[in-house]
Design a protein with these regions (language model features):
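Short alpha-helical hairpin
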Residues: 4-19
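An active-site-proximal "capping" alpha-helix that borders the catalytic cofactor pocket
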Residues: 37, 73-84
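His-Asp-centered metal-binding catalytic motifs of divalent-metal-dependent phosphohydrolases/nucleases
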Residues: 52-69, 77, 94-104
Length: 217
């Protein structure tokens, strides 16, 4: 489904707003993360289908109310969609997609219910793995002043969102608590294929990391 001219205007306004909002963000959830997720979501949609306006808008807005970045009770996403006069039904769909994007713990069921939500979720998860994923993981760990690694603190597979949200473990644990699990949590065939090499890269990185940690290399 092609994007209508008036929808394209809404997208460009949103892009400008999101760029200014996230331009100086330093935790790995910056404008360039959003830019990559948007581009990947549109790439996935070429093979998987879906409403391109909903996909691109949700990709642009997916971190605006993320719990890691926004502690306010009021939804900035809903407020923005209202301000630019997005159709009510479309706004509801976009908010639903955004709500379903985030990883909430290894034991929490994936609730992406539409092709648009599955695509945006996959695009976001692909940006959490591979070389970019490694870089973003350490950026976030540094942002939160977390140690890189502690041999005495073992990874935990969180069975609920509260446990996952309150986790303060070393950064290396995040690979085992989330990143290495993402390959098998993807929804679309296109994303699953892209994830293969990114997953291998992380495994190679961890092997090298632990060899250097022990002084073997």
């Amino acid at each position: 489904m092609l994007v209508e001219p008036f929808e394209n205007e809404l997208l460009r306004s949103t892009e400008k707003y999101i760029h200014s909002h996230f331009e100086n963000e330093g935790s790995g959830h910056d404008w360039w993360h959003i830019h990559r997720v948007r581009n990947m979501a549109l790439k996935l949609a070429e093979n998987e289908g879906g409403n391109l306006f909903l996909i691109e808008m949700a990709a642009l807005l997916h971190d605006l109310d993320d719990w890691k970045l926004n502690s306010e009770n009021e939804s900035k996403t809903a407020k923005w969609l209202k301000n630019i006069n997005v159709d009510n039904l479309q706004a509801e769909s976009i908010l639903e997609i955004v709500e379903q994007v985030s990883f909430k713990g290894a034991g929490v069921e994936n609730n992406a219910t539409t092709i648009e939500a599955r695509i945006v979720q996959d695009a976001d998860r692909l940006d959490a793995i591979g070389a970019i994923g490694v870089a973003r993981t350490f950026a976030y760990g540094g942002h939160k002043s977390r140690p890189i690694y502690h041999p005495g603190i073992k990874p935990v597979l969180h069975t609920n969102f509260e446990s996952y949200k309150n986790n303060t473990a070393p950064t290396i644990n995040h690979f085992y608590e989330k990143l290495l699990l993402l390959k098998n949590s993807l929804n679309t065939a296109t994303a699953i294929e892209i994830a293969k090499n990114r997953h291998i890269f992380m495994e190679t990185f961890l092997k090298q990391f632990f060899a250097e940690w022990e002084g073997d290399k």
